[in-house]
């Protein structure tokens, strides 16, 4: 078995992107830069999301916050898992052999990303129930049922990819930065079809069906409200501003997150299907599509922070609290600092 960090067996280390190897640094420079950069972004971004959710109570009013926080924790674990290939590429010795390391890494990342995919599907179902059954929503969607659903998401995602340890085939290309995974662990067309039929296809169909109906119903509600306002305004001689469906704006935020997820994952899924069915492989394509898909773990943070006003207020409140605590800590350390008698002006969320 070849090792990616054993310099005695090869003149230079194994690199998926051969163009990124430099003799001066003796490691795969381009791969290290991409993976370490994404790892830092994913970990820092999702830590911020988790802290904001804990510090902004208004964000927890929606039941979808359960699933969004689940995605944030799963994405955070993706970032932590990416430390393994980062350290391996930098020649830090791994605690277990390379074959087991890349299998476990590929399995863990596949499970975590499928948790995000299943959570997005559950979010769309939750919003669909809120739109179609508003009167019975609180009795249908309870905190206990949400926790049970999250537990089933983790269990189901684990079971879908568990056969990869029983010689069913490779679940993805996440571990291909290790030489054993790239050269000795191959995909299987039947296992790939199994993953697509059990996870990718159902999640995509659920999302398409629910959001199509959500926006259709919201459009109908908006039209009815506009017609009623027009009749009322004509009777009273007043003009009112048209109102939109109250759930449509929040659904748009979730739809953006879902759309970006599938846009970033679509090249990976297409390549996964083509490579496992035809046997034609490309190291460059597998690396780029895989890490493009993994980059979604950071994109969720960006979309939510830019689209959700409550999240923005929570983020400002968190940053304000941190700045205030840092300022008070600095003032306490400096005995010559003149302290104000009154509390600093500011709003707390």
Curated annotation (Swiss-Prot):
One of its GO terms (cellular component) is plasma membrane. It is a multi-pass membrane protein. The keyword Cell membrane applies. It holds the Pfam family 7tm_1. It is found in: Cell membrane. GO terms for molecular function: G protein-coupled receptor activity. It comes from the Eukaryota. Residues 54-75, 126-147, 213-252, 305-349 are cytoplasmic. Residues 1-32, 97-104, 169-191, 274-283 are extracellular. The chain crosses the membrane at residues 33-53, 76-96, 105-125, 148-168, 192-212, 253-273, 284-304. Glycans are attached at residues 2, 8. GO terms for biological process: glucose homeostasis; insulin receptor signaling pathway; negative regulation of insulin receptor signaling pathway; positive regulation of multicellular organism growth. Its main location: membrane. Keywords: Cell membrane, G-protein coupled receptor, Glycoprotein, Membrane, Receptor, Transducer, Transmembrane, Transmembrane helix. Orphan receptor. Belongs to the G-protein coupled receptor 1 family. This is Probable G-protein coupled receptor 21. It comes from Mus musculus (Mouse). The gene is Gpr21.
């Amino acid at each position: 078995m070849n090792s990616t960090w054993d310099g005695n067996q090869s003149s230079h280390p194994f690199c998926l992107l051969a163009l990124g190897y430099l003799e001066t640094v003796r490691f795969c420079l381009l791969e290290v830069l991409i993976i370490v950069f994404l790892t830092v972004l994913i970990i820092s971004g999702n830590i911020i999301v988790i802290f904001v959710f804990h510090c902004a109570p208004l964000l927890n009013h929606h039941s979808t916050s359960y699933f969004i926080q689940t995605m944030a924790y799963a994405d955070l674990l993706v970032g932590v898992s990416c430390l393994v290939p980062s350290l391996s590429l930098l020649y830090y010795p791994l605690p277990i052999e390379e074959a087991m390391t890349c299998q476990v890494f590929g399995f863990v990342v596949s499970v975590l990303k499928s948790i995000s995919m299943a959570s997005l599907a559950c979010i769309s179902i939750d919003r669909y129930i809120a739109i179609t059954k508003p009167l019975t929503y609180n009795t249908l969607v309870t905190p206990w049922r949400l926790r049970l659903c999250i537990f089933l998401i983790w269990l189901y995602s684990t079971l879908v990819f568990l056969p990869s340890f029983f010689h069913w085939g490779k679940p993805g290309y996440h571990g291909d930065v290790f030489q054993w995974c790239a050269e000795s662990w191959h995909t299987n067309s039947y296992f790939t079809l199994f993953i697509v039929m059990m996870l990718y296809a159902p999640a995509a169909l659920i999302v398409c069906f629910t959001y199509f109906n959500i926006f259709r119903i919201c459009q109908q509600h908006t039209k009815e409200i506009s017609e009623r306002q027009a009749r009322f305004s004509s009777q009273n001689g007043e003009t009112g501003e048209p109102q939109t469906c109250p759930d449509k704006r929040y659904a748009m935020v979730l739809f953006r997150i879902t759309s970006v997820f599938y846009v970033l994952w679509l090249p990976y899924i297409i390549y996964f299907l083509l490579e496992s069915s035809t046997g034609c492989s490309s190291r460059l394509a597998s690396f780029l599509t895989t890490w493009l898909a993994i980059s979604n773990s950071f994109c969720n943070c960006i979309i939510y922070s830019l689209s959700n006003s409550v999240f923005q207020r929570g983020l400002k409140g968190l940053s304000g609290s941190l700045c205030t605590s840092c300022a008070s800590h600095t003032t306490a350390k400096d005995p010559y600092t003149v302290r104000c008698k009154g509390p600093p002006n500011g709003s707390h969320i």
